[in-house]
Amino acid sequence: ERNDDHLDGAVYSMHVQGGFYLDDFVAQGGVSNDTDLIQFITDNITHGVVDLNMTAPEIGCSSFTATAENGDALFARNYDFSKTNAMLVFTDANEGRHASISTVDLQFLGIDVDQDMTGLMDKVICLAAPYAPLDGVNDAGVSCGIYMTYQGGEETVATSQDTDKPDFTSTTLLRLILDYADNVEEAVEIASSYDLHDSANTSYHYMVADASGKSAILEWTNDSAVDTTDNDGSQRTLKVVY
């Protein structure tokens, strides 16, 4: 329920049955930018009924992992949003893919943060939500979140690798990890198998953890640059910190 006095948006949930064409997305080698991602979603899911756009609000999120007294592995994450509409997206297991629960910031899909989502067109837009997770957990106990890094000095420069690997964008890489990874090492293997192209002209890194309590930070940096000179997103490579 919305509480405008407290600057809270609304929270929605959606259960996605079926594969939402992710296997086809992987088979085509992903995409290298948000425009091509929107085109894939339009061609396969929304079929041009609505106009899609993807933007990223300015955020400064944080996470931690911990072990509870009973031995459970915990993954915590906050969103430093002033206000947003959020959606919990439930997806089913499909032919070698895990079931998962993920969180989507509906601002990213162009949903008005100051309005409740009541119209049919807003609901059609939300069919794109499985491709825009900011964090989530799958049924193997793998959790993953995405966070802005603001790399590049005065102006943020997006990571945009340029090798012969297939291409994936920020949120679609997180979707791959949720659907296909059994543990942290498999998440790292997935991330290292693709060229990353950050979405919305900004830069990101990831935290991933699994049911054993193991965790890692995945970040893309230029070995020869410092924060203020890391201005060439094509020269960044994946670094993993356990």
Residue ranges and their predicted role:
Residues 80, 192, 213:
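Residue-level marker of positions within ordered structural domains that often coincide
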Residues 94, 192, 206-210:
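A sequence-level detector of short, solvent-exposed, charge-rich linear segments
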Residues 201-242:
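Extended amphipathic alpha-helical segments with heptad-repeat/coiled-coil character used for oligomerization
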Residues 1-185, 196-200:
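N-terminal mature-domain region immediately after signal-peptide cleavage
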Residues 189, 193-194, 202:
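Extracellular-facing segments of soluble proteins and assemblies that are Gly/Ser/Thr-biased and enriched
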